[in-house]
Amino acid sequence: MICGTTINYRNLVHKVFHQPDYVTTNRKGERLYERVNYSIFLSPGSLAYMRGRNASNEYFRKELEWYCSGSDKLEDAVKLSKFWTKCSDDGKTVTSNYGKLLLHDRNAHGFTQFEHAYNCLLNNADTKKAVMTVYNNEHAYISNDNPCTMFVRFGIRENMLNMLVVMRSNDIWYGTPYDVAWYSVLHHAMLKELRRAGLPVEIGSYEHLMLSA
């Protein structure tokens, strides 16, 4: 586990390459270094900032706009990066847009994942049900378009809004810096909505668990 008020990115990567749980070779003949159940823990009030990783603010801004738009069109995704062409099964859509899955798609009861978690917290501040499910039964098929995030859990303890993000896989270089930033934004968005409803809560901890990194 990497703990702190900011993230020492070099330390994060160093442990993957120099203290891996597994070293394998993929179908392309590339050597892969992997740590399993690898987590980042940001204490309350921390910044989702990775020291030592010069991430692109421009890319994150565009990614955030894409998430908020809820678009599943590949033509919108490739405006961020051509990488997204590899994630589309039909060459037209990308269904793993986190904003679409969490903020736009509604279930049979009429709620988005974000609204459900919010309602759970508002109904009972001690709830253990404030979970946003990303990877669901609709993703149970062989695809290039499977979300890396499995679920997000919010919990209020001692008036602190804590968040846990669990990812089945997370690319340390291309994924982690932007995923941590995105979920930090979502963490603060939930805090803002709960405060607006009158709950006396503060920003709590954020744990980012990567089952494979």
Task: Give the residues covered by each predicted segment.
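Terminal, non-catalytic protein-protein interaction segments that mediate quaternary/complex assembly
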Residues: M1-A213
